[in-house]
Amino acid sequence: MAGIAFHVGSQTVSADPYLHALDIARELFEEAEAAGLKLRVLDIGGGFPIPEPKVKFNLPEMLRQINARLDEDFADAEIWAEPGRYICGTAVNLITSVIGVTERGGQPWYFLDEGLYGTFSGVLFDQWDFKLISFRGGDEKVAATFAGPSCDSLDIMFRGRLTVPLQVGDLLLVPSCGAYTSASATTFNGFSKAKFVIWERVKAEVEPVVAVGRVEMNQSVAQAAK
């Protein structure tokens, strides 16, 4: 046995759960040493948070407290960490479209081309509160149910979610989809996983075309002004 690993849970916004786990780990290290087993590795897992609109946290202060406790109680141990969501969570955004609209029980239902068996698996497994941002304007808001494309009654992501009224073909932006989405997505019922578009590549292809268009437009304006 080389060491001990723990995980405090995803999107942990306080150092307290880590400090509590470190107290337990310290006791286990001491018990192991008393039994003649020298542990040399401590894996503090993941759980480091990414920004969310309604969640406040001070990550530098969290890390300061964790590091101080590690220096105090585990100075001789090899420290591992698994910052999964923290590394890739904000690196990917999803664009999903409305493929069906109906009404049930007096409430609109919007069916998307991505569902619980795809990118939104985190709703079930991580209780992750995905944000839905509509490109459609308007001040009117309705409480709606959002479901995925499969025929499974489990494939429902959100109930009572406030949104502007939507139509088939409308697009929704879902930010921060880089963690535990495509990795756990399936092809259930024959639906393909969401395709990736690398923004830097698209930008490199589009910018020269846009630049040429701007030059031509400026030349036309200059000609018209003469």
Where are these regions (language model features)?
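Active-site loop/helix belt of alpha/beta enzymes
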Residues: M1-G100, L154, T163, N189-F191, ...
